[in-house]
Amino acid sequence: MNIFRLFNKQRTAPAARERLQVLLAHERSSAGSDLVSLLREEILAVIAKHVELDHDKVQVTIDRNEFVSTLEIDVEIPLNAAVQAA
């Protein structure tokens, strides 16, 4: 047993942080397509409650960088769309 080892504890925070970053990057990349399709369907369902729309004229894009993920949804609503009461 080395007595210096008792007083010189290793710092594990950098290794834990790196493992967490790898795990988060993996989960973001694997769950991205499922999340986008789920969000698209739920958002379209909410919009369809209030306005008639063509589901084919909806574009969904997701942009990812190191710190932020951005979901952009373009919905084309005709000028003569019937507005429904909620």
From Swiss-Prot:
A Pfam match: MinE
Signal sequence extent: none
Gene Ontology BP, a term: regulation of division septum assembly
Residue pairs linked by disulfide bridges in the UniProt entry: none
UniProt keyword Hydrolase present: no
Keyword terms: Cell cycle, Cell division, Plasmid
NCBIfam families: minE, PRK00296.1
Family according to the record: Belongs to the MinE family.
Job of this protein: Prevents the cell division inhibition by proteins MinC and MinD at internal division sites while permitting inhibition at polar sites. This ensures cell division at the proper site by restricting the formation of a division septum at the midpoint of the long axis of the cell.
Designated name of the protein: Cell division topological specificity factor
